[in-house]
């Protein structure tokens, strides 16, 4: 484990209660990485409870997929131990970055369960270092394009700034932003909510 990573939530369970033969780190094609982090939320708290709620709900769903006519979990889904770095947003981002990059190098499809938006910074950084011409699709009400907020560039309001600088960022559903973010956004890659509800969209 990379220096700076703190593991607080360990699990012996598998995702959605799938058989253990499909939930091992070695055989799984997919890694689910819980990051119950809520350190920079500035209005409502509670995003840190998301991963646990998601995992509990997963145990009550059907595992057969109608669209693919298959049981997709048989490709293997590994539920990794949660990263819960609480000391600072900088250390959390580094922890996520190191862990995600390690799994990518092991040829795993990494999916994170959060957590507030700042957890995306480390993951996007890891993917952009491993893949050329990366496109990031952001579905969100806010652009999160501030270079810094409340003294940190790792704040939830800055979650997409680095992605804008290093990847092809496409933002969909935007309905609220700060004026300063209009100066850095790529207007051709932003789809505002009020435009999407029109008949001409």
What does each of the following model-derived ranges do?
Residues 1-8:
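Short, Lys/Arg-enriched N-terminal segments with co-localized hydrophobic residues
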Residues 8-201:
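Conserved alpha-helical scaffold segments that buttress catalytic/binding sites
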């Amino acid at each position: 484990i990379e220096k700076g990573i703190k593991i607080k939530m360990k699990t012996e369970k598998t995702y959605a209660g799938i058989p253990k033969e499909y939930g091992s780190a070695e055989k799984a094609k997919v890694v689910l990485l819980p990051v119950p982090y809520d350190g920079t939320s500035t209005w409502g708290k509670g995003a840190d409870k998301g991963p646990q709620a998601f995992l509990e709900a997963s145990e009550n769903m059907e595992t057969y997929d109608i669209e693919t006519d298959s049981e997709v979990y048989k490709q293997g889904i590994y539920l990794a131990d949660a990263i819960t770095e609480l000391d600072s947003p900088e250390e959390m981002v580094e922890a996520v970055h190191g862990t995600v990059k390690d799994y990518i190098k092991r040829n795993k499809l990494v999916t994170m369960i959060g957590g507030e938006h700042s957890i995306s910074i480390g993951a996007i950084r890891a993917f952009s270092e491993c893949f050329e011409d990366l496109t990031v699709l952001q579905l969100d009400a806010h652009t999160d394009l501030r270079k810094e907020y409340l003294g940190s560039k790792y704040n939830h309001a800055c979650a997409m700034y680095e992605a804008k600088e290093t990847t092809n960022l496409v933002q969909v559903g935007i309905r609220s932003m700060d004026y300063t973010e209009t100066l850095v956004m790529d207007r051709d890659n932003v789809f505002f909510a009020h435009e999407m509800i029109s008949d001409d969209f």
